[in-house]
Amino acid sequence: MSESLSWMQTGDTLALSGELDQDVLLPLWEMREEAVKGITCIDLSRVSRVDTGGLALLLHLIDLAKKQGNNVTLQGVNDKVYTLAKLYNLPADVLPR
């Protein structure tokens, strides 16, 4: 069973906690535009697992923030996230470092 996903915006940082798993993404997906408003950093240090659905949502959050005029960095990213992106042949710069 998947752990829940929670998020909190503190200043310009969106901190995610739990699993970025397809089974628990819907609440964040529904709040995505509000969740990224004004953010320049997405903190994944409390994320325990990311699947392909979670990676897709993460990429979408980054894109939404960029469309709002913000450059986004990632913090606390597990190397497995970058490996997953590489396995799907995503461009190296799709996930900011």
Curated annotation (Swiss-Prot):
Consequence of gene disruption: Mutation leads to accumulation of phospholipid in the outer leaflet of the outer membrane and increased outer membrane permeability. It confers sensitivity to SDS-EDTA.
Localization in the cell: Cytoplasm
Any one GO MF annotation of this record: phospholipid transfer activity
Top-rank lineage group of the source organism: Bacteria
Cytoplasm recorded as keyword: yes
Main location: cytoplasm
A GO biological-process term: intermembrane phospholipid transfer
One cellular-component annotation, GO: phospholipid-translocating ATPase complex
Disulfide bonds: none
Effect the entry attributes to changing T52A: Does not affect the assembly of the MlaFEB complex, but abolishes ATPase activity
NCBIfam families: mlaB_1
PANTHER family from the UniProt entry: BLR2341 PROTEIN, INTERMEMBRANE PHOSPHOLIPID TRANSPORT SYSTEM BINDING PROTEIN MLAB
Protein name: Intermembrane phospholipid transport system binding protein MlaB
Species this protein is from: Escherichia coli (strain K12)
Lineage, highest ranks first: Bacteria, Pseudomonadati, Pseudomonadota, Gammaproteobacteria, Enterobacterales
Encoding gene, per UniProt annotation: mlaB
